[in-house]
């Protein structure tokens, strides 16, 4: 479904390249490996194994220019109202740096810096309090980002505090977490933008009761008064966030409180520094050498010109095992839209399904389908050049597998035995971090954030709302009383029948 005139020339390029193999593209463009690689700070990214050539890339860049992507990026950074449906700015970039001369952004940066200083005081107080464990309760953007970063960067030994995350309303998750902890040495953080999220309120009540009160409870919310009142949390233990920060973009804010507890406040600030470095690049680099722009345009090529309906992310570093789940929310909640900013239906397909896992485990699960299945699945392969553990041979084997898989997917290998034939032609992007440092992880996450925004500009959709998640939550709130024994009118025939089954 791609009928927009801006794609016309790109369709002709896609048709022209239909039979071209990735090795033939490399052979036809002697400088391709160098020209389709960028280094931004601690990140090296290569698009050389994608299936566009120089002419097609120029057409993609022309589309970006036609859609005024550069100006749109500037509007985002300046704090203009890019979230039209909710009448808000999207100033997550101001949480991590002052990179643009604009009053709204400067004020947001100053506000965020002041709250971060307050957070630092709380971090140091908790580190010195005798508390050994912290339970962080949140869901979605209040959980996935902090959980990812804390898991990726937590020290192997010597951590001052152990941070545990609970998100699912399933009581088994909280039960398993609390079973290993001592309430006298545990603190809790409740994170919710509205403090009306069912999962967080229910889990928060369990945690509050288990702790014996609110003395060691903290909260992060854009509704701090409601947060303080709901669990009688002292105002000096409630950190604010703001409605100009979307949940899935909020780990850089006080939502990152559990990150700072898990990895240390200084390393949390280094995470922000890495993201700010990518911000400056996204804002200032020309489109043709702009890493998030090129990543976003590559995804446009694979989705709209080649029709690929899914996208895989493979992290060849176990510490990044949670990155695919984080990116699922970032990408699919931002881009899973069917109407344009003006409410009219989109004229192109939008977001593919994002999924993935950690290498080398994934080679023994779904890579069979990647290599020989009927669907071509573009992929991002992410690895680290240097390791922090003492097992050098293991790290070398990990990198060897990463390189081998990208080569095999791209080049394939013919065989007279059709069962052993590898067709190749599977595109991938290679992303290498110098090492898994806070700066590198911050830059990586910020790159994906900006690439998502680029795609939203091309598709003319709003990347910063998520109304699609509301209906199911509303229905669940109405059905909960029925499961608790109340007489509730249920209109849906199937739901009525299942409720009857559940009550037997």
From Swiss-Prot:
Major location category of this protein: cytoplasm
Entry keyword Isomerase: yes
Locations listed in the record: Cytoplasm
Pathway: Carbohydrate biosynthesis; gluconeogenesis; Carbohydrate degradation; glycolysis; D-glyceraldehyde 3-phosphate and glycerone phosphate from D-glucose: step 2/4
Enzyme Commission designation: 5.3.1.9
Superkingdom of origin organism: Bacteria
Coiled-coil segments: none
Active site, per annotation: 333 (proton donor), 364, 473
Leading EC class: isomerase
Annotated keywords: Cytoplasm, Gluconeogenesis, Glycolysis, Isomerase
Biological process, per Gene Ontology: gluconeogenesis; glucose 6-phosphate metabolic process; glycolytic process
GO function terms (MF aspect): carbohydrate derivative binding; glucose-6-phosphate isomerase activity; monosaccharide binding
Cited InterPro entries: G6P_Isomerase, G6P_Isomerase_C, Phosphoglucose_isomerase_CS, SIS_dom_sf, SIS_PGI_1, SIS_PGI_2
GO CC terms in record: cytosol
Any one Pfam family match given in the protein's UniProt record, by short name: PGI
Catalytic activity: alpha-D-glucose 6-phosphate = beta-D-fructose 6-phosphate
Claim: Endoplasmic reticulum is one of the keywords in the record: no
Protein family according to the UniProt entry: Belongs to the GPI family.
Known function: Catalyzes the reversible isomerization of glucose-6-phosphate to fructose-6-phosphate.
Protein name, as recorded: Glucose-6-phosphate isomerase
